[in-house]
């Protein structure tokens, strides 16, 4: 019985995420369409609402083509690992109750997201294609680089909250959002999440003129769909993490209001991701690295030191009464 309940809970957690990912792709195509003065998908079902289901059926019923001289085990494992790590990130996130309430929830989220680098590297190396390998090396360098700033920003917010659990972040933001007190961190966090999820204007892994389609160029059908699902799952989870860190709804009496509030804010942030894609051109690779190592990293380290010293100095001030 406990095993059945565990499996049921996990499925009840995973299935809504995958449905949300499917309709995020539809929202992206609709938004890009309207921003380019066209309709977007409007044939399959009423207003094109069945388009994600049709796309999924088409991809999973196609024959997965395996080129010669490939590493078959890694070719199959890498898309599976990508989606697994993307879904594992959700386990410590409170909505309002987490699937597993971890003491080091934020650190575990960062550790799981850094594991996704392995799937990207395997996906580029397994097909034995130079274009896929160059694309994966770019993606790995970009992901590892921006994880540094994400880690330091997380450390800075932990200095303000005083703990590693996500429930503590909710309690801290009962009266005011952390966005109001640490908006430079929030700004750098948002830009770093764009780079971490390989979204425009940092989608250098998909420079069509250079690398055809990046590290997943040799994938088709089901394995490609798994990579696609993993990418959009990461987008939603990163935006959800942004909400919890900086614009948390706070502990309310009604859990359903907490979840509704969180979903609305996550949707707004996801729409801003799509808006940025429609508005800005792609960065050059040197500009991408310059932004991180020369601008974001010194700033985040300085703010981390400030937050650490501020909390220590304030705790040393004697009470007024």
Curated annotation (Swiss-Prot):
EC class name: translocase
Bilayer-crossing regions: 7-27, 73-93, 104-124, 148-168, 175-195, 227-247, 256-276, 297-317
Pfam families recorded: NADHdh (PF00146)
EC assignment: 7.1.1.2
Record localization: Mitochondrion inner membrane
GO molecular function annotations of the record: NADH dehydrogenase (ubiquinone) activity
Catalysed transformations (reactions): a ubiquinone + NADH + 5 H(+)(in) = a ubiquinol + NAD(+) + 4 H(+)(out)
Main localization, broad class: mitochondrion
Superkingdom assignment: Eukaryota
Keyword field contains Cell cycle: no
Membrane topology value: Multi-pass membrane protein
Gene Ontology cellular-component annotations: mitochondrial inner membrane
Key words of the record: Electron transport, Membrane, Mitochondrion, Mitochondrion inner membrane, NAD, Respiratory chain, Translocase, Transmembrane, Transmembrane helix, Transport, Ubiquinone
Biological process annotations from GO: aerobic respiration
UniProt function note: Core subunit of the mitochondrial membrane respiratory chain NADH dehydrogenase (Complex I) that is believed to belong to the minimal assembly required for catalysis. Complex I functions in the transfer of electrons from NADH to the respiratory chain. The immediate electron acceptor for the enzyme is believed to be ubiquinone.
Protein family according to the UniProt entry: Belongs to the complex I subunit 1 family.
Protein name (record): NADH-ubiquinone oxidoreductase chain 1
């Amino acid at each position: 019985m406990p095993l059945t309940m565990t499996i049921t809970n996990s499925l009840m957690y995973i299935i809504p995420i995958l449905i949300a990912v499917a309709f995020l792709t539809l929202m992206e195509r609709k938004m890009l369409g309207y921003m380019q003065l066209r309709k977007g998908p409007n044939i399959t079902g009423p207003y094109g609402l069945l388009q994600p289901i049709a796309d999924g059926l088409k991809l999973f019923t196609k024959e997965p083509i395996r080129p010669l001289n490939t590493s078959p085990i890694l070719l199959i494992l890498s898309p599976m690992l990508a989606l697994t790590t993307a879904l594992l990130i959700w386990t410590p996130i409170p909505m309002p109750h987490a699937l597993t309430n971890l003491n080091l929830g934020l650190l575990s989220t960062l550790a799981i997201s850094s594991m996704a680098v392995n799937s990207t590297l395997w996906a580029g190396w397994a097909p034995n294609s130079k274009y896929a390998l160059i694309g994966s090396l770019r993606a790995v360098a970009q992901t590892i680089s921006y994880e540094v700033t994400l880690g330091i920003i997380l450390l800075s917010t932990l200095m303000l909250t005083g703990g590693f659990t996500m429930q503590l972040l909710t309690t801290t933001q009962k009266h005011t959002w952390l966005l109001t007190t640490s908006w430079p961190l929030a700004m750098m966090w948002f830009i770093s999440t764009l780079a971490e999820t390989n979204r425009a204007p940092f989608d250098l892994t998909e420079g069509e003129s250079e690398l055809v389609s990046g590290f997943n160029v040799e994938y088709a059908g089901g394995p490609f769909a798994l990579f696609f699902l993993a990418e959009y799952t990461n987008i939603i989870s990163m935006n959800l993490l942004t909400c919890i860190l900086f614009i948390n709804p706070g502990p309310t009496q009604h859990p359903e209001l907490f979840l509704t509030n969180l979903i609305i804010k996550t949707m707004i942030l996801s729409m801003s991701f799509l808006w940025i894609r429609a508005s800005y051109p792609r960065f050059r690779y040197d500009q991408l690295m310059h932004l991180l190592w020369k601008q974001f990293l010194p700033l985040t380290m300085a703010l981390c030191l400030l937050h650490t010293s501020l909390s220590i100095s304030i705790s040393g001030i004697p009470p007024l009464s």
